[in-house]
Amino acid sequence: MFSKVLPFVGAVAALPHSVRQEPGSGIGYPYDNNTLPYVAPGPTDSRAPCPALNALANHGYIPHDGRAISRETLQNAFLNHMGIANSVIELALTNAFVVCEYVTGSDCGDSLVNLTLLAEPHAFEHDHSFSRKDYKQGVANSNDFIDNRNFDAETFQTSLDVVAGKTHFDYADMNEIRLQRESLSNELDFPGWFTESKPIQNVESGFIFALVSDFNLPDNDENPLVRIDWWKYWFTNESFPYHLGWHPPSPAREIEFVTSASSAVLAASVTSTPSSLPSGAIGPGAEAVPLSFASTMTPFLLATNAPYYAQDPTLGPNDKREAAPAATTSMAVFKNPYLEAIGTQDIKNQQAYVSSKAAAMASAMAANKARNL
């Protein structure tokens, strides 16, 4: 029954799961009692500029609405449902909560207000993403911006084009993908906007190898190869490719694996180098570091687009989102910091709100500094 669903897996019995049919989808997926099916986000759900967080939300491993998510819930979800140890996500979580406090203007404590605020540009979100457009990519005026939060098929295709015709890719391929994305963003962004975020993207490269390298290959731990169909399905659907034979790596990947893969990507020789590369794009990069309010963070409006889900029929029968209901509301449920509903046209009010929050934070920081002198 499932021979067509699992074409790349020789023996399903080798997996630590049985195979189950997802209700109403025609899709089989490895199943244990902790595995939940994909449910498309609705127009009022909050989603991040991050396919990992969005996949966890779409499967209900963190709150499906993408709001009020505790640090412990995030840690458990990555560990239990992605096979990613806490050591890997510690820095990213720290930065997420810093951005949460920055955007909302108050300490978020142990609960991330929502996923959407992570799209604040040049913070947790960054330029030259593998699958998102930059905040000011292709705009005509300095005050214009576009959706930098949702998956963008055209952008992701520029990543896939580098490895066209392959079933797997290695460190050198990933280095070429990385350089391609930097080059295109550098060319297409509004002049003066592009900021190279090499340390963050390096960690993301290692994360991709940690999550979707092909564990069916005998040398996967030492020389991992990313299975492209797994990567494509995960990013495009923001869902886990269970039906393609994927399951969370076991034992869970630790930070040592991710940093080793990241370093190997940067050290790998490439066969071609795109033009328009920013200075320092090639070669070793600096470490990713915790964000701080001491850094020059600037408040920006965030896009109010409805959450993405794949609807492209060319993706074929394995696309779980083809039957998902389309967003019909013209209201953005959030405004920065994503707590109140406003019309999508009400940008002036949103700008005023962001500015008032920034001014209040600046005053509080100045007062605190004066007290400490």
Swiss-Prot record:
Please report the PTM annotation for this entry: N- and O-glycosylated.
Biological function: Catalyzes peroxidative halogenations involved in the biosynthesis of clardariomycin (2,2-dichloro-1,3-cyclo-pentenedione). The enzyme also has potent catalase activity and in the absence of halide ion, acts as a peroxidase similar to plant peroxidases.
EC nos: 1.11.1.10
Active-site residues, as the UniProt record annotates them: 204
Q: Give start-end of the signal peptide.
A: 1-20
Q: Which cysteines are joined by disulfide bonds?
A: 100-108
Organism from which the protein derives: Leptoxyphium fumago (Caldariomyces fumago)
Name of this chain's protein: Chloroperoxidase
How does the cofactor bind to this protein, according to its record?
Answer: Binds 1 heme b (iron(II)-protoporphyrin IX) group per subunit. Binds 1 Mn(2+) ion per subunit.
Q: Which reaction does it catalyse?
A: RH + Cl(-) + H2O2 = RCl + 2 H2O
What keywords appear on the UniProt entry? Answer: Chloride, Cleavage on pair of basic residues, Disulfide bond, Glycoprotein, Heme, Iron, Manganese, Metal-binding, Oxidoreductase, Peroxidase, Pyrrolidone carboxylic acid, Signal
- Highest taxon listed in the record's lineage: Eukaryota
Which of this chain's residues carry glycans? 33, 114, 237, 259-260, 262-263, 269, 271-273, 296, 304, 314
